Amino acid sequence: MAITKDDILEAVGAMSVMELNDLVKAFEEKFGVSAAAMAVAAAPGAGGAAAAEEQTEFNVILAEVGANKVGVIKAVREITGLGLKEAKDLVDGAPKAVKEGVDKAAAAEAKKKLEDAGAKVDVK
């Protein structure tokens, strides 16, 4: 006589919590699976709404220094308030973020100062 699905459900329904825990562990070992909850995938249309919102925080990235390295270092010092050595290290390490998480106006102002000094700047 074969065991039916209903027989299995009745047997599982009659088990205690400890017995069910042991059963789950046995299934995991026997079949190489995990009973951990799986992450739910986002709905396909959900990403469009987030992209439509206006970005409020921007990162000012120094992409290239250009020919006027001294002028760019001065601009970085003015924008960030860093010391001479720290500003020079930042400029030498380009591409690097000069300002992060700033509003649109501050990002535009920093970009203008850096570009006026001869640097190539990205705002993301």
From Swiss-Prot:
GO terms for cellular component: cytosolic large ribosomal subunit. One of its GO terms (molecular function) is structural constituent of ribosome. Keywords: Ribonucleoprotein, Ribosomal protein. Gene3D superfamilies: 3.30.1390.10, Single helix bin (1.20.5.710). It holds the Pfam family Ribosomal_L12. It comes from the Bacteria. One of its GO terms (biological process) is translation. Belongs to the bacterial ribosomal protein bL12 family. Forms part of the ribosomal stalk which helps the ribosome interact with GTP-bound translation factors. Is thus essential for accurate translation. Homodimer. Part of the ribosomal stalk of the 50S ribosomal subunit. Forms a multimeric L10(L12)X complex, where L10 forms an elongated spine to which 2 to 4 L12 dimers bind in a sequential fashion. Binds GTP-bound translation factors. This is Large ribosomal subunit protein bL12.
